[in-house]
Amino acid sequence: MCDEDVAALVVDNGSGMCKAGFAGDDAPRAVFPSIVGRPRHQGVMVGMGQKDSYVGDEAQSKRGILTLKYPIEHGIVTNWDDMEKIWHHTFYNELRVAPEEHPVLLTEAPLNPKANREKMTQIMFETFNTPAMYVAIQAVLSLYASGRTTGIVLDSGDGVTHTVPIYEGYALPHAIMRLDLAGRDLTDYLMKILTERGYSFTTTAEREIVRDIKEKLCYVALDFEQEMQTATSSSSLEKSYELPDGQVITIGNERFRCPEALFQPSFLGMEAAGIHETTYNSIMKCDVDIRKDLYANTVLSGGSTMFPGIADRMQKEITALAPPTMKIKIIAPPERKYSVWIGGSILASLSTFQQMWISKQEYDESGPSIVHRKCF
């Protein structure tokens, strides 16, 4: 970046993790849990200078003495005071920048309520005094990151899963589907089925261990029934995992039973359609003329699409639902855990994007509603 060209900041706020960094970089510099913790009791130790709140990794490590809150539920901000703390932490502690010196690109969930985008805009200009800002839809950024402007994105993170059909860079709101089943639910489910095996995981600390087991050992079976038979008849699918205390546990069919819930939400007692059916339903809500482009450009995005085998299984399931001659292509970029952020980094550094920013002046003239005119 040249001196007169100040780097824009890109902040992707997810339900589970916040990803932040500078436009033009190829990966976020800061990735930390979207958590705000407050002390349960007034200062136990005198003179400790106990803070009234902790954010991210520090909140995670001190969780024994804190009450933890996630300000983003199912992808949508529900607690603005805590959200402000997360942004403050992002700018001042993680990136170490002055927000009044950089344009800021924020991301939002598909179908984010209008009032929420206005509130984000207001906080950026009034609390952080940013010179300019923009709000982009997460799935659209993932599509850009894959080098496309038309396609359907299956974005599954920690708190929510969406299928978002996009045509020429614009999300089609009537066809967006939301599924409240994502990484956090899969971790809970794995805790449950490991308990059935005789291992007890209950506390928040143990939940983090199970999340690690999920990320390291789970995979999606191409044929679930057959995989179950293989698991029953042999020990070839068993893997061992060493817990922090040195105990070694063995995990078998749980490895693929856990992510199978994405395709069969009934495993979690949910009546919803699986991710394959949801994707298909989303495509069917679109104009018949663009369906071919969506089938051929189905892009996976988000941490909960990182399971090995998920792309092949999606290919198989959607092929079974789609018209027989349809060409179906599932794109699973290796960096898809961060593709929303990467798409934001690409967008904010395009020369053609520079006139798209909402400036402080425009905000002062029009108020928060300017966001609906300039970001869509």
Swiss-Prot record:
Q: Which residues carry this modification: N6-methyllysine?
A: K85
This entry's Gene Ontology molecular function terms read:
ATP binding; hydrolase activity
List residues, modification Methionine (R)-sulfoxide: M45, M48
Organism superkingdom:
Eukaryota
PTM summary from the entry reads: Oxidation of Met-45 and Met-48 by MICALs (MICAL1, MICAL2 or MICAL3) to form methionine sulfoxide promotes actin filament depolymerization. MICAL1 and MICAL2 produce the (R)-S-oxide form. The (R)-S-oxide form is reverted by MSRB1 and MSRB2, which promotes actin repolymerization.
N-acetylaspartate modification sites are D3
Quote the subcellular location field of this record: Cytoplasm, Cytoskeleton
Q: Specify whether Glycoprotein is a keyword of the entry.
A: no
Task: Give the EC number.
Answer: 3.6.4.-
Question: What keywords tag this UniProt record?
Answer: Acetylation, ATP-binding, Cytoplasm, Cytoskeleton, Hydrolase, Methylation, Nucleotide-binding, Oxidation
Please list the residues that carry the modification Tele-methylhistidine: H74
Residues recorded as bearing N-acetylcysteine in the entry:
C2
Name the predominant localization: cytoplasm
PROSITE patterns tied to this protein: ACTINS_1, ACTINS_2, ACTINS_ACT_LIKE
Its function, per the record, reads:
Actins are highly conserved proteins that are involved in various types of cell motility and are ubiquitously expressed in all eukaryotic cells.
Kindly state which reaction or reactions the protein catalyses: ATP + H2O = ADP + phosphate + H(+)
- Pfam family name, one: Actin
SUPFAM superfamilies, per database record: Actin-like ATPase domain
Mind telling me which Gene3D superfamilies this protein's record contains? 3.30.420.40, Actin, Chain A, domain 4 (3.90.640.10)
Q: Which GO terms describe its cellular component?
A: cytoplasm; cytoskeleton
Family according to the record: Belongs to the actin family.
Q: What is this protein called?
A: Actin, cytoplasmic
Q: Does the keyword Membrane apply?
A: no
Q: Which CDD domains match?
A: ASKHA_NBD_actin
